């Protein structure tokens, strides 16, 4: 098990045959957290006299995504919404926490996908999943080209009622990847296929915001683990307590 924390990274080694448990702590490496993870694995194996080649599973808990949100160091995110819903993140649910004083002191955080990087798709899906207005692909291409010129690093697609019919979102992603193959695209019908467009939008935008950094981190870590341990399987702790 591996859990990076600042300033230390904790490691726990379990021998499934003997039931023996060993632990170790090493300094974290903020510039590249994967280095600290690998150092910790090497340390706990050395202490336990276990060869790295004997490790079969690495279960990893990380706060890379959380830290990215808290420090505001995520990707430059573009957003595609249905025409008429461009300000979905700004309007939100018009909810202010607290009593009357909340209206005076509450400071709403800036959306992770700013309004100037939000475009509208001319399309409409009904609540029953029926196509009310066919997606205007030519207008979409023009809008996506303008987003590409803004040097976005990730793209979110959140169309009204897409949880009932994801056809238009999937088409938007297809066109976006054609125009911006290097930009990762997250669509709400896959991230959180649920009712309520604001909640769907903000969740999928958050996914896009942390995605490039988390993808790079996990890919680098997995690559290094496989190089050192060959048959090892990497599992990452999810927010619900499960492993993926």
Predicted regions and their residues:
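N-terminally biased helix-coil "hinge/interface" segments that flank
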Residues: 1-244
